[in-house]
Regions:
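Flexible "arm" and connector segments at domain edges
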Residues: 1-404
Length: 404
């Protein structure tokens, strides 16, 4: 994971608080404060676990790269706690800077509002190498601070006078900043990277990636139909069920079975390729099956529509299927709740391919919608699925009869 590059604009604490709050799903809940403070504790625990695994398993990512995401997630929860307690972002930043300057035996001089992450980095840089802490010591300090926050009764936190609560959270914020410094991370980079993750996973507004086969570039014979229907027909052989698929009354592809000793419905797995088309505008497998390869562009034809891309897509579909099989095929999982590590792994698998530019929330919609229709196909032993690439939908219609 590449660390976020610094921008020309400076990220202020009020801006971070506003943008990060857009993904807060705990708002107006009676347990909001508990969820946020326990979330902070959990992310610090994940930070410690990531560092431990990096040493034990000799992972290729550096400890700083691993720490950056965990510290970013912890920051999100910490600012959520501050908002819940009515602490303004600038006040939180001032308390953090005052704590750092006092610890460095400096005059607690405060910058003008709005407080920025660059202000905090400036304080850390002014004493670079002089904080007299090791990475291990600082992990212990922030773990202790997170534990104390989790152990303090919710009622006690809410009963604190605002100045006392601000000072208290400011101290925790300073421990977070020192943890960033211990991992040679700039707080502004960590905060920006966290905002990028939020936009990738939980955007305030959904805006789909443009289609990969626009009419302005490709002729009709090289474009997916913007709307089409595939009929899935389950039939029974002497030993096992199999599925055939039809497009406009014409069979396409080979008959599919579960290819497993234990029946699991894999015979309907082509629904996932349809979901990728509907929500991502991508499926090298279906391009090949429907003879829609973009041969007018030899580079695209070779690298994006070729055999390797097809193998990767089939590998993703199979890997996700195996992950879902142990989780009721994602029944009941809502958008925004799918395993984030799963989505990150998919991102790494499609790195270098056109679909790699699609945000993770699009992948999540494709996966969850695909499995929603998959469960209907299993339940109804087939059906018709309509793909709409403009509205980004999959629609299922149950079969009117049971074909044998």
């Amino acid at each position: 994971m590449n660390l976020a590059k610094r921008r020309n604009s400076i990220l202020s604490l009020p801006e971070y608080s506003l943008r990060s709050s857009e993904s807060n799903k705990f708002t107006a809940s009676d347990d909001e404060l508990d969820n946020l403070r326990f979330g902070f504790f959990g992310e610090i625990g994940s930070l410690l676990s990531s560092v431990k695994r990096s040493i034990r398993d000799q992972v290729t990512e550096s400890q700083s790269e691993l720490a950056s995401e965990e510290l970013g997630d912890a920051l999100w929860y910490l600012f959520g706690v501050a908002r819940t307690l009515g602490i303004a972002p600038d006040s939180l930043g001032e308390a953090c800077i005052s704590t750092l300057r006092t610890r460095a035996n400096e005059i607690a001089k405060l910058p003008a509002a709005p407080i920025t992450f660059a202000n905090i980095d400036g304080v850390l840089d002014s004493r670079h190498g002089q904080w007299d802490i090791t990475r291990t010591q600082q992990l212990g300090s922030i773990a202790n601070a997170a534990g104390m926050l989790a152990a303090t009764a919710k009622e006690q936190l809410k009963a604190m006078a605002l100045p006392a609560a601000t000072t208290y959270l400011g101290r925790i914020f300073s421990e977070w900043a020192l943890a960033c410094s211990a991992f040679e991370l700039r707080t502004e980079d960590v905060a920006r990277e966290n905002l990028a993750k939020i936009a990738d996973r939980w955007p305030a507004k959904l805006s789909f990636h443009p289609l990969f086969d626009p009419e302005s570039i490709y002729e009709e014979h090289e474009r997916f139909p913007r709307e089409f229907s595939i009929e899935f027909i389950e039939r029974q052989s002497s030993n096992y069920p199999y599925v055939v698929q039809r497009l406009r009354q014409v069979n396409i592809g080979d008959r599919l079975t579960d290819n497993s000793n234990e029946p699991d419905g894999y015979r309907f797995h082509d629904i996932f390729h349809l979901a990728y088309v509907a929500y991502l505008g991508w499926s090298p497998v279906l391009r090949g099956l429907l003879k829609l390869k973009r041969k007018s562009n030899p580079v695209i034809d070779e690298n994006q529509d070729g055999a390797r891309a097809m193998i990767i897509e089939e590998g993703i579909a199979t890997w996700i299927f195996n992950h879902a099989k142990d989780r009721d095929f994602y029944d009941g999982i809502k958008p925004g709740k799918l395993d984030f590590s799963l989505l990150k792994q998919i991102r790494s698998m499609v790195d270098g391919y056109e679909v790699g530019s699609c945000p993770l929330w699009q992948w999540e919609l494709a996966i969850l919608s695909g499995f929603e229709v998959f469960r209907e196909l299993i339940r109804n032993k087939g059906g018709t699925v309509t793909v709409n690439m403009i509205d980004h939908t999959l629609k299922f219609i149950a079969p009117t009869d049971q074909r044998k």
